[in-house]
Amino acid sequence: MLLPLLISGLLFRNADAFLPFFNEDDLKYTFGVDTHAEVPNHEEIDPVPYYHQNGSLHKLEFMAFNKKYNLSLEPTLAKLLSSGVTVVKKNEKKGGSLDFGSTLDSCHYHHYGEKVYAAISNCDGRIKGTVIDDGEIIVVHPFPDHHAHRSKRATENGAHVVYKRETLAGEPKDFCGLDNVVTEESLVEDESAIFEDVFVTGQRLTQQSDLIVELAVFVDENLWRHFSSKHGGMADRKLQDYTLTLLNNIQIMYYQPTASPPLTFRVIRYEVLTRQPSALAGYLHNHGNAQMYLDRFCRYQRNLAVRDWDHAIMLTGYDIHRGAGSRSISGIARLDGMCDPWNTCTLAEGLDFTSAFIGTHELGHSVGMRHDEPYCQSKHIMSSSLGPGKVTWSTCSLRDYHQFLQRLDGRGKNCLRVSNMPNKLEISSNVKPGQIYDANLQCELMHGNGYQQVTPRQDSYDGICYMMWCGQSSFGRIITSHPALEGTFCGPSKWCQLGRCVPWTGTNEIQPTVQHVAPVVTTLPSRIDGSWSGWGATICSQCTCNGILGSVGLAIARRTCSAPYPANGGSDCVGSTSRAVLCSRQCGRASKSVDEYISDKCMEQKRLKNDRELTGKGSQLNRFPQRACKVFCDVQQHYGSQRNYRFFGDNLPDGTSCGYDRYCLDGECLALNCNNNALISRDQSCPTDTCPITDQSSSVYRGQWGTWSLWTSCTATCGGGYRKRNRACSITGQCEGNEDETEVCSSESCPSVLRVGNEWSTWTEWNHCSVSCGRGSQARYRKCLSPHRTLAFDCPEKNIEVRSCDNGPCNAIGVWGTWGGWSTCSTSCGPGTLVRQRTCNREPCDGSAHERRSCNVATCQNDGIWSLWNEWSDCSRVCGKGLRSRSRSCFGSGCMGASSEQQFCNEQACASSSANDWGTWSGWSQCSVSCGAGVKRRTRTCRTGNCPGNYKESAICNDRDCENKNAAWGGWGYWSSCSETCGDGVRKRVRKCYGSGNCDGQQYEKQYCNLRVCDFRRKF
């Protein structure tokens, strides 16, 4: 039976009469804006709710923007909250309260229609939520209570407003703090921060099970203070309702038809920080600097002793920013962070209802979604700018999402398919929480592993109902904790009720004991740990060669984590899904170097994406082992000499050389193992299968086609064009069928176009200043467009403008001390360097703590230059004072000083012994080369006394000549930066010898460079 609360009809009217009375807080609460000028187009409505007899909302009706909405609603609390959710409130003394979600109301609902989707909450009798209708987001929100009397037609439900989510006047377009530039510096400092590009071709995603994000929600002190000042004693309840309302609206966005597969968010921990922990203190992140606060929060949630969630989100009361004077962003997350304990974290402002849209976007980043631009239109959820109609997921987002899930499944570590939750028993009606979770378990849930109840004296045991104490050990630090849960043992035949220790009545309840009590019967499923299947067969006739110089042929076997799949919190399989047996050391038909292969791929990406930033070239990043088997494409350098890259998800072919006796397999660089016969990861044993290794051409083997690539963009938007796709053969030239495929597209007639010739688009907004304070630079951009509004490349002038900017003097936080004095010149004659330092009085400081400048004390009398010292030789004696030496080389002539030096070593007295006893020689090492003159070595140890003779021995090996017919140089690498910023300097480049044998010529090349004449007046 339905009970309609209003019979008066569906009412709507303009609410402008209210607005003059709204202060800044009212505007923020209702519309998420700061000024009256930013208020979007809106209407006042009187929604009509219908309730079941049990009090749950069943249906909602209202009229908005000349359309009637009739929403049938389903409750969602059971989906939003785990049955074992832990609710924690911490105060400044690390105490607080602990609960299991019993106080959370079921006041959140979803509507699923053919074209209309909605997330509605009515926790305080007022309607709040979003309706997604035909590409638009309509927000329903109550007016502030203290303005309700201004409505002449207000009902008992209170006055409500409805408005469309759109770009507001003055609202910053770039609300997201994620930076997706890949620089050479970021590769060096943090390889895990590489941001991959979109349009990655992968296999169709296999939906093995539901995808559930077990979520930990944290609320910081600033947001708690905001709710506390506004709601007083109701702050806890209001904050919980508000948080779940946000998540309810985020959830509906991930349940849309365009989100495939759907993603379910389930809260397993909700923690309010009424006092900010020291690790998150404001001065550590410049009071809301987005990147700094996110970094601190990621470390904080990772280091918590209690951690059983897939992702952590912090709702903050800070107006987060990029730096001094910048308040343009509202959220930030780690790209690809989901399931990575150090990076599975999101920071979002929580002061108004727009947090639901920000959270949706940022959580998308965590599951691999990049910004849509420039490859998809700016009209979807993952657009880098706010705007109307951004309620669906783009093709770019779904490709990123699917590829991310495939990577997780491929590693066997997809946390979204298994639960991290420990086996928590549900609390039945006749068992109280304190009987299921005894005092020790309560301490552990509140503070983490290792914490237990500090047992009080027997005469004061009943005090735990008011305040229970927890500590790490009998000698550890004691922490003021929380009142014990209802039903906790507090003395013989006593338990806690309403904060007091009272006798157990024995009526319909299980008697409390000091021991942990659990129901005998439980519906918890048993834990199933994942286990590897057997290896697939190694088929030597399918030996694959990739046509790249220096590669080897491989026969690959695979396995899956399916015997059984992990379930119910069971652990994943550990290790790799692939291994390979060597079947050819010298693949025939090799026609290109690794860098040539990479450049071909990068040119293909440049053509497919029509991206002028790509140079069409790339090179292997051998200095980063984790990236040596990935295809990185160079991006044009606009400033300085730092190289930038983009990664499009391509791996180098299996068998490609990635170092000395190291080769690629599934994008990983692995060393030859198992007597140089196999590529296996660290956890695997050597395969029993072997293949006859051949050095002949691989043309005797049949190749296999890979999957088709994505279709290219159509060559025309109308009037008939064509598009292409291609596929690769595992053995070049050994597959039947065509490598390329072409089809007609955009065959419809073109409309008449008045514009003639290409023209520039309007300039973008100036981007953010390069520094947070002081003087820096900023840029803006524009695109060259054809009459059909597609990208063109022949517009006159430049597509970028740069200007200086000044963010004002730097604030007191992060002030540099004065510079110290200059050091002495690093050389006594010729070019050298002076260095001086300064100290940051308080972090963070912009700029460098070191400054260098050139010096030249005197002209050297000769042109000789010493090399660096070699390593010290081994000591001549193991005890009793020996000697060791080192040497250096003179480049040129007339170097001043000695070419060698000695020093004493092992000066300790020798143990008394009548015999000097050598141990046996070790076995000979492998020869240092496979052909040509090499060296092998062996060693022995002096067991007693001071043994005469050497402890190591060398011998010549492999003195046969190398065959040079297959040795060939790869292309030269890039020139290094000039060693001097002005005056004469040196730059270098290097190339690699591929194949067997030695290449003729030099591996390294250097040349002099002179960027500009030094201005000594300015320099000194």
UniProtKB/Swiss-Prot annotation:
Amino acids binding Zn(2+): 361, 365, 371
Domain notes: The conserved cysteine present in the cysteine-switch motif binds the catalytic zinc ion, thus inhibiting the enzyme. The dissociation of the cysteine from the zinc ion upon the activation-peptide release activates the enzyme.
Signal sequence residues: 1-17
Proregion residues excised on maturation: 18-163
Class of enzymatic activity (EC top level): hydrolase
Domain TSP type-1: start-end pairs: 702-751, 757-811, 813-861, 863-911, 915-963, 966-1015
Species in which this protein is naturally found: Caenorhabditis elegans
A biological-process GO annotation: extracellular matrix organization
Taxonomic classification: Eukaryota, Metazoa, Ecdysozoa, Nematoda, Chromadorea
Positions of glycan attachment: 54, 70
Residue positions of the active site: 362
Gene knockout outcome: RNAi-mediated knockdown causes a reduction in adult body length and width and a reduction in adult lifespan. The cuticle displays several defects including disruption of the lateral cuticle overlying the seam cells, abnormal constriction of the annuli, discontinuous alae and mislocalization of collagen col-19 positive fibrils. Prevents the up-regulation of a transcriptional reporter of the TGF beta-like dbl-1 pathway, RAD-SMAD.
Disulfide bonds: 376-396, 714-745, 718-750, 729-735, 769-805, 773-810, 784-795, 825-855, 829-860, 840-845, 875-905, 879-910, 890-895, 927-957, 931-962, 942-947, 978-1009, 982-1014, 993-999
Function: Regulates body size probably independently of the TGF beta-like dbl-1 pathway. However, may regulate some dbl-1-mediated transcription. Plays a role in cuticle collagen fibril organization. Required for embryonic development.
Example of a GO MF term: metalloendopeptidase activity
InterPro entries: ADAMTS_ADAMTS-like (IPR050439), ADAMTS_CR_2 (IPR041645), MetalloPept_cat_dom_sf (IPR024079), Peptidase_M12B (IPR001590), TSP1_rpt (IPR000884), TSP1_rpt_sf (IPR036383)
Motif (Cysteine switch): 174-181
Keywords, comma-separated and alphabetical: Disulfide bond, Glycoprotein, Hydrolase, Metal-binding, Metalloprotease, Protease, Repeat, Secreted, Signal, Zinc, Zymogen
Protein name, per record: A disintegrin and metalloproteinase with thrombospondin motifs adt-2
This enzyme's EC code(s): 3.4.24.-
Location(s) in or outside the cell: Secreted
